[in-house]
Curated annotation (Swiss-Prot):
It holds the Pfam family HTH_18. It comes from Escherichia coli (strain K12). Residues 305-326, 353-376 bind DNA. It comes from the Bacteria. This is Xylose operon regulatory protein. InterPro entries: Homeodomain-like_sf, HTH_AraC, HTH_AraC-typ_CS, LacI/GalR-like_sensor, Peripla_BP_I, Tscrpt_reg_AraC-type_HTH, XylR_PBP1.
Amino acid sequence: MFTKRHRITLLFNANKAYDRQVVEGVGEYLQASQSEWDIFIEEDFRARIDKIKDWLGDGVIADFDDKQIEQALADVDVPIVGVGGSYHLAESYPPVHYIATDNYALVESAFLHLKEKGVNRFAFYGLPESSGKRWATEREYAFRQLVAEEKYRGVVYQGLETAPENWQHAQNRLADWLQTLPPQTGIIAVTDARARHILQVCEHLHIPVPEKLCVIGIDNEELTRYLSRVALSSVAQGARQMGYQAAKLLHRLLDKEEMPLQRILVPPVRVIERRSTDYRSLTDPAVIQAMHYIRNHACKGIKVDQVLDAVGISRSNLEKRFKEEVGETIHAMIHAEKLEKARSLLISTTLSINEISQMCGYPSLQYFYSVFKKAYDTTPKEYRDVNSEVML
């Protein structure tokens, strides 16, 4: 006698990293539970959404951040688990079993990270209400609540929706806003994509990040880290855990378990700290300029003389001011920047160690191994094996 195999439909946009991670979480539950499910992922379900009731199978896990999906499933008579963002008002939740990413906790994690760095001015770059992204509205609400509770000054800019035809206009308006922010402001972007827009504008305007502005995103999207010169700090959502919990809950529903309407909040995984929030409370303009130059050119084999030329003051003057502000010599900071770049590439890429050594300006692989071992008490290979963030 064979157990009944359930046919389960997943309604997600597989082109989005967040959606893919939710689906991966569903897969992890199937592997762990050995459930007899046949998974159906409709690649272009929007083309047939008006007849959605004809092909749903025995149960559904769906993206309820998408209003169109929520409406299409309103009167469906199969077990449904919605996945989406949390709401600060209970009545905003859809009337289905629901697994939510905790929007308040996501923004709070970013906010606390910036506070720990010594930032005490805050800004939020969101999305316009016309975008229809309810999770963006909730994250903006969370930011306003947090700065009000802590009695900080916080400013919000929703910006424009970006498309190829208005891209430059949107970036120009973002540039106007960024130039109104006082130095040492920490900006929380509603997504990594919006954070990347900030980093691009800062580069065009020669605003040093993180010396003058700090930026943190939400999502920890793999793609974003490769598209910006300054590596982006980000809050990693528990998207896989959401998928796992959704599948686990659906399993209980398929087993006819009686339960009240479930609303499960999934907290963020952690803050992934990178260069964009590596903030030092610097006030001396010459030191800020020198630090920015070093960050951008350390791996090109620069010496102290090039830093002095870039800043335009004498060595004794800059060394004195540098020591007072940073607590290190200029030479030591160049060395530290090269090493940090190498460490970051080891854990965030699959580049060969020899290639990383060359990219970071070391004269030989042997010398790189020697310097790295002295700083971290382990070899570059051993460090990568333990700390790699790359999913192979």
